[in-house]
Design a protein with these regions (language model features):
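Ribosome large-subunit tunnel/peptidyl-transferase-proximal elements
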Residues: 2-88
Length: 88
């Protein structure tokens, strides 16, 4: 356990940041699942809506540092391929 006040604050801040990052990554996973379910159901309208929301969540996670830039690009690419399955 830290004894120095600034280190105690840093521990609190690290924990707060960890929770924020986990929340953002969890949102990305959730919207990814929702997109897959909409595509599996064949619902084009819902899939498009889920896709847009997913891209927004990914961009936000990258912007805040919860996801690396390349990881965000990879997830967006995968999402686009999943959405493209509706066209077949």
């Amino acid at each position: 356990m830290a004894n120095i006040a600034s280190q105690k604050k840093r521990i609190q801040r690290s924990e707060r940041e960890r929770r924020e990052n986990r929340f953002r990554i969890s949102q990305v996973r959730t919207w990814f699942r929702r997109l897959e379910q909409a595509v599996a159901a064949g619902d084009a309208g819902a899939a498009e809506s889920e896709y847009r929301q997913l891209l927004s969540k990914i961009d936000k996670a990258v912007k805040t540092g919860a996801l690396h830039r390349n990881a965000g690009a990879r997830r967006k690419s995968r999402a686009a391929r999943i959405r493209a399955r509706l066209g077949n």
